[in-house]
Amino acid sequence: MAMIGYVARVLTGVRFKKMNHMIDVVHQKCGQNKVRTFFDMLWCAVRYGAGYYDYTMFGFYDMTGAQRDTYLTRVRNKKVSNIMNDMAHDDDFDDKLLFNVRFAKYLRRPTLNGETATPEQMAQFLEGQEAIFAKINHGSCGNGVEKLYVKDFESPAAMLDYIREKKLVVLEHVQAQHPDMARLHPQSVNTMRICTDLVDGQVHIAYITLKMGRGGGVCDNSGQGGILCRVDIDTGKICSPATDDYFNVFDKHPDTGIPLVGYQLPMIEEAKALACQAALEIPEVGHVGWDMAIGPDGPAIIEGNDFPGTDLCQLAPFLSLIHISEP
């Protein structure tokens, strides 16, 4: 009954302006009649639990029913999370201040609580730093993240006033990057999303994707203009073109020109090991997406997501989670 209620909320919460935009995108991509697309989207919502964004970004408009049925859609993903994750532990991940305390040993960089910090603690935190990252405590998709430069503030106290006014109270030193990660897009901290599933005490890696910034932006999230691609779990090599939230496809990074497919990411085994270790910390939360940076000396977790989106591994240029072929 809870899942039926969730589906009903999804259907009744449709934002028709955004839905119309997705219908336009489908028409531009394949020429499909817009009325047909509208009703096909409704059918996919009922049959597969797919929202209009799922329909467009997964390429449902160009698939058979059997192929559509291999995808982890919005409603199905919610069901997975409900089965594998105890909601009593939501704040361990959704509250970034709490997460930074709970998983401190995996972060490998100093953090500070801007809500409680004194000017003296802020001054000590900023010592030797050119810039820091400041985030809102409950945010997603890269929203509410700023890179603050020390030179732009008269004093540590002035920066503290600013972050409290803007509610950017999750403070972190800028994570240094391995050269092979930085060269993809030097202005952003580029991260792997490593999704782990804890089943019967064993950690399994479901997928790995790579998120990269673009256009000089400091955020690698596709919701903030970044791009993403699939990574081979065994080799750590990029195994798909990149795409963005506007369904553009890139064989090379659009800014640095680096060819993507076949690019070897560094320290993949160390990154997988760290994700698997972190996955055991809260066994009541078995399905987690870990955003992992690779520093010069090893991996570091940026954050954990207890409701990891399915778009990161199933966008149209990628393979579905279950490969299926038909005669």
Please place each PLM-identified region on the residue numbering:
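A short, polar/charged loop-to-alpha-helix boundary motif
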Residues: 217-220, 310-320
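Beta-strand scaffold of nucleotide-dependent catalytic cores
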Residues: 184, 190-197, 203-211, 219-221, ...
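Active-site nucleotide/adenylate-binding loops and adjacent lid/helix of ATP-dependent enzymes
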Residues: 83-201
